[in-house]
Design a protein with these regions (language model features):
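Active-site/acyl-donor-binding loops of N-acyltransferases
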Residues: 2-27, 31-44, 85-104, 235-319
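Acidic-and-aromatic substrate-binding clefts and catalytic sites of carbohydrate-active enzymes
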Residues: 60-62, 132, 244-250
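Long, charge-dense tracts
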Residues: 53-57
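Aromatic (often tryptophan-rich) hydrophobic motifs at membrane interfaces
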Residues: 168, 173-281
């Protein structure tokens, strides 16, 4: 029996990702410590305290509402956020590069200067999973600490046995690779990406903390430029996506991606609320109340910034 596939949005001539590849990717995320499931032909993982999200930005889903409500009931998440075809849902930008002649001229001027400075101290290239296991420990430790990752899922990322398991799961995913910036033998920043059809999609990026005068200060700038230039030059790749605008939006990250030469393209999201919450929150009054709580208290309780997902779910759930 043939396994189902999903069509990629905006692919040149159309492209698809197989059910088996999604299953392997689910295994990778699970090894990483993310609560993950493959349901309705869609790969989902937990996103923040309140929601679950479809993983691939460039792959619109055709999942039925009843399946999404079932997922929310089983996972006890309050909201689901997932990609849908154009013409439905809420439109947000995703950041895509299609220029096969990508070069420093694509970069914003200051971004280009940061790349030039970083290239004097750092080496950017594809790296092996064996290198990642041993050379990215400090990078992962600092990223987890910055994200408040202790004692949340992900702490095991620093354990040698967990890293071996992650590397093993990664090798099972077709065309899953790492691009990294090295400072000596240490990885200062890296980006994990996967290719399917003619699309390459960035999945996960970590970096070290850097002081103003540190040689690793602009590792992420060099990383994105080197990754984009190496990947778009592959004749099998016609486009690279480095994710969509987050909810809540992070303007600094949006600006970084645009300055790196990635251009906004429309991405349509659908929001669905848990069946027990939907009757109470699917209205403008509830969304406004949630916004007042979020704006008033998120400065003191940062996790409340994620209430914006609930606001959007209440406002957009009928789309």
């Amino acid at each position: 029996m043939n396994k189902p596939t999903q069509e990629i949005a905006g692919g040149n001539g159309g492209a698809s990702i197989s059910h088996s590849a999604l299953g392997a990717l689910a295994g990778f995320y699970s090894a990483w410590g993310r609560r993950t499931m493959l349901q309705g032909g869609v790969l989902w993982f937990d996103c923040g305290a309140f929601s679950t999200m479809s993983v691939l930005t460039t792959v619109p889903t055709g999942i039925a509402d009843r399946e999404v409500r079932g997922i929310l009931s089983r996972t006890r998440k309050l909201a689901a956020v997932y990609r849908v075809a154009a013409g439905a849902g809420l439109e947000v930008p995703m950041f895509v590069l299609r220029d096969k002649e990508y070069s420093p001229s694509n970069l914003q001027r200051q971004f280009r200067q940061h790349v030039e400075r970083a290239s004097s101290f750092l080496e950017a290239r594809e790296c092996s999973w064996e290198e990642w296991e041993t050379c990215a420990l400090n990078c992962d430790r600092q990223t987890l600490a910055r994200q408040g990752g202790f004692p949340q899922p992900g702490q095991g990322l620093l354990c040698p046995s967990v890293r071996r398991r992650i590397a093993g799961a990664a090798r099972a995913v077709p065309r899953l690779r790492i691009h990294a910036c090295f400072h000596g033998k240490e990885i200062a920043a890296y980006l994990i990406h996967v290719a399917f059809g003619e699309m390459c999609e960035g999945l996960l990026a970590h970096r070290v903390d850097s002081e103003i005068d540190s040689p690793t200060r602009h590792a992420s700038h060099l990383l994105y430029f080197s990754f984009a230039r190496a990947t778009i030059s592959d004749p099998d790749i016609q486009a690279i996506c480095v994710g969509r605008q987050s909810i809540p939006a992070k303007e600094s990250l949006t600006r970084f991606k645009r300055h790196a030469g990635f251009l906004p393209e429309p991405c349509h999201l659908r929001f669905r609320l848990h069946p027990l919450l939907a009757p109470f929150l699917e209205n403008g009054f509830s969304a406004a109340l949630l916004k007042r709580v979020r704006v008033g208290l998120s400065g003191k309780i940062p996790a409340l910034a994620n209430l914006e997902v609930m606001e959007q779910a209440g406002l957009c759930s009928r789309r």
